């Protein structure tokens, strides 16, 4: 009886030890990989409620992002201070403070690194690692990484209208040359 208890205890101990060691090793690899990323280029699928849109996007850390939605003749630009939606079809530009959007957390690499370093993943399955970030306004942002390549795969959040918004990446390229000019906000008269 005592031998059985010892075997069960040892098995349980080794399981806990190796799971924690494996998790720490994984987090270290993810942190090291993410530290080396300065730019991202990718195609995306964005889903807001039942509405699905496609496009391509460029991110340059910190705080720069431009995404094009070709079918909608629309783009979004974050230039470090402002977040704008450019609707070329209507020749309109809508301005917002970047600080008031969830993108502020996603475009600061240090915030994501801090999240990985100081948090346990929300979920780990065979392909995806999911972390959850809670912003200052209690907005929850789920951030997805590929378990095998450790690439950032996208995020999911709730918008101001209580719609679930998912933004998923594919065809990801890292550390490509991206000129700062693409993040320049146009003037409405130039549309």
Regions found by a protein language model. Give the residues of each.
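Gly/Pro-enriched, hydrophobic low-complexity segments
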Residues: 114-191
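A short, Trp-centered hydrophobic/proline-enriched beta-strand micro-motif
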Residues: 32-52
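Solvent-exposed strand-loop boundary residues in beta-sheet-rich modules
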Residues: 48-50, 89, 161
């Amino acid at each position: 009886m005592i031998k059985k208890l010892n075997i069960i205890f040892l098995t349980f101990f080794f399981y806990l030890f190796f799971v924690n060691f494996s998790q720490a090793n994984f987090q270290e690899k993810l942190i090291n990989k993410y530290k080396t990323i300065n730019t991202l280029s990718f195609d995306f699928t964005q889903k807001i409620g039942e509405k699905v849109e496609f496009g391509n996007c460029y991110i340059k850390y910190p705080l720069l992002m431009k995404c094009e939605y070709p079918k909608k003749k629309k783009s979004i630009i974050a230039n470090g201070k402002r977040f704008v939606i450019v609707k070329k079809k209507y020749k309109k530009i809508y301005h917002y403070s970047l600080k008031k959007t969830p993108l502020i957390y996603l475009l600061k690499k240090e915030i994501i690194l801090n999240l990985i370093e100081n948090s346990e993943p929300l979920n780990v399955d065979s392909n995806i690692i999911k972390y959850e970030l809670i912003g200052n306004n209690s907005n929850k942002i789920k951030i997805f990484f590929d378990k095998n390549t450790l690439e950032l795969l996208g995020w999911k959040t709730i918008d101001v209208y209580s719609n679930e918004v998912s933004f998923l990446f594919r065809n990801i390229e890292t550390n490509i040359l991206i000129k700062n000019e693409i993040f320049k906000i146009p003037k409405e008269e130039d549309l």
